[in-house]
Amino acid sequence: MKARVLIVDDSALARRNLRQILESANCEVDEAEDGLAALERYFLERPDVVLLDLVMRGMYGLDVLEKLRQLDPLAKVVVVSADVQTSSQQLVDQAGAKAFITKPFDREEIIGTLKAVLGGTS
């Protein structure tokens, strides 16, 4: 799978784990550790998909998602979060996320979800 992916998570460990999974699938990876950096990186790099954590310092992930979708209605965002509350998942769906992956995740779940979101792009 060849895709450009922006990882947005304030946890360096989570970013590293996602990067390893994505690079093993031949993805180009960029990272941001907070919401403001994510918005900047998105418009500089124009990734195919964004993997976005919800609970971050500074700017909550849902706010990042809403801002991205306002500025680019075609933005493909997959939320990756330990927040398993149904209400959070519903808010994310309403805000326009393409998918919701619950932490902890595994390689197959990440790659399978990205393929589905990107329309099977290989």
Predicted regions and their residues:
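Residue-level signal for the "D+5" position in two-component response regulator receiver
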Residues: 31, 58-59, 94
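The feature encodes the CheY-like receiver
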Residues: 57-58, 85
